[in-house]
Swiss-Prot record:
GO terms for cellular component: cytoplasm; nucleus. Magnesium-dependent phosphatase which may act as a tyrosine phosphatase. One of its GO terms (molecular function) is metal ion binding. Phosphate binds at L12, D13, S74, R75. The active site is at D11, D13. Present with 6190 molecules/cell in log phase SD medium. Belongs to the HAD-like hydrolase superfamily. This is Putative magnesium-dependent phosphatase YER134C. It comes from the Eukaryota. Its main location: cytoplasm. Keywords: Cytoplasm, Hydrolase, Magnesium, Metal-binding, Nucleus, Protein phosphatase. InterPro entries: HAD-like_sf, HAD_sf, HAD_SF_ppase_IIIC, MDP-1_euk, MDP_1_eu_arc. It catalyses: O-phospho-L-tyrosyl-[protein] + H2O = L-tyrosyl-[protein] + phosphate.
Length: 178
């Protein structure tokens, strides 16, 4: 059994939500609030509706409940859009509706390798950039990022652009099946 990592890193585009935030979205953004106060869908000024993948709140919540540090690792060239929508999306965690951004402990952006994102994030979280010093996983939709495995990071390939990371994929990761 793989079990829980120390750090779980998530790409954003096609891993948290089904679009490229730096090309599909233009602010301002209108939140669509559900009856329980969550905001799982936003609408951009062009009318494009964006809903986070349905299992993301459950996956992130389970990781947080088990003491895992959460990190974004995104190559987006428009981090200000990603940051804004992470603050607008709201999910229920520990009985409270909170911005999705609040679930993350570290944010890494920029057009560079995921290895760079992970090293810098680890440096900020633990004052070390040695990727083998912690148990780390990366959820990502781009197979090229499997290169992180050369550095001891478990790569969890999110193959389904319509549904994103499913609870089953997540459970398969935890049990060592992927």
């Amino acid at each position: 059994m793989t079990g829980y990592p120390d750090v779980a890193a998530f790409d954003l585009d096609y891993t948290i939500w089904p679009c490229y935030c730096d090309t599909h979205l233009h602010g301002p953004f209108k939140p669509v609030k559900s009856s329980n106060g969550e905001v799982l869908t936003i609408i951009c000024r062009d009318g494009y509706e964006l809903t986070i993948y349905k299992d993301i709140p459950r996956i992130l919540g389970d990781l947080k409940d088990n003491g895992v540090k959460l990190m974004t690792a995104s190559r987006t060239w428009a981090p200000e859009i990603a940051q804004e929508i992470l603050k607008i999306f709201k999910v229920k965690y520990a009985g409270v509706v909170t911005p999705l951004a609040n679930l993350f402990d570290e944010f890494q952006w920029g057009e560079r390798s995921k290895i760079g994102h992970l090293r810098d994030g680890l440096k900020d979280l633990y004052n070390t950039s040695d990727l083998k010093s912690k148990k780390i996983c990366l959820f990502d939709d781009e197979s090229r990022n499997k290169e992180v495995e050369k550095y001891g990071v478990k790569f969890v390939y999110v193959r389904d652009p319509e549904n994103g990371p499913s609870w089953k994929l997540y459970q398969d990761y935890l049990s060592g099946k992927v």
